[in-house]
Amino acid sequence: MTQDTSTYYVWIGGSCDYGHKERAGGAAVVIEHNGNIISRDVISDLHTTEFRMMLTLMIKVMLEIPEGSDILFLTNAAYIQNFDKTPTSKSANPDLIIQCIEEKKRHNSVGVKIVQYHKSPLLIETHDMATEAMAKTRKEYHQKNK
């Protein structure tokens, strides 16, 4: 993929462990701008999903990137393609989608591009970061609640 030097390319991935009763979810980003990695971030929580974590992190990224920017989120998670579509009564995470719609207004353009996971080393890195953060959150929870 040829990168435009003015666009912020945000690789975003998530992970969720549906097999545990406390169901931890996590999301991570690697942000590229002007051909360089400028930041990495990761979040995780209990009793959530990776999609909720990914939308939360998208909002955080849109708040942190300078107003008026061009942002392209790169992911293999088709779910987040609808981050800027008005939620319906059947939409999951309508609260976060509404926040995404609001934050998108601050920028020149914000989009999502679906990429192949196995061909995207930075996307693989985000998944690994999210999985690690999720495991840490779960471990801390169990240590506190022994």
PLM region descriptions:
Residues 1-52, 64:
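RNase H-like nuclease fold core
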Residues 6-7, 115, 139:
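Intrinsically disordered, low-complexity segments enriched in small/polar residues
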Residues 15-21, 59-127:
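RNase H catalytic domain
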Residues 28-31, 91-93, 131-135:
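Short, low-complexity, polar/charged sequence segments that are solvent-exposed and flexible
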Residues 36-39, 59, 98-103, 139-144:
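Short, surface-exposed, polar/charged, turn-prone segments marking secondary-structure boundaries
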Residues 52, 56-60:
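Short amphipathic alpha-helical face segments that pack within enzyme cores
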Residues 124-146:
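Charged phosphate-binding loop/patch that engages nucleotide di/tri-phosphates or the phosphate backbone
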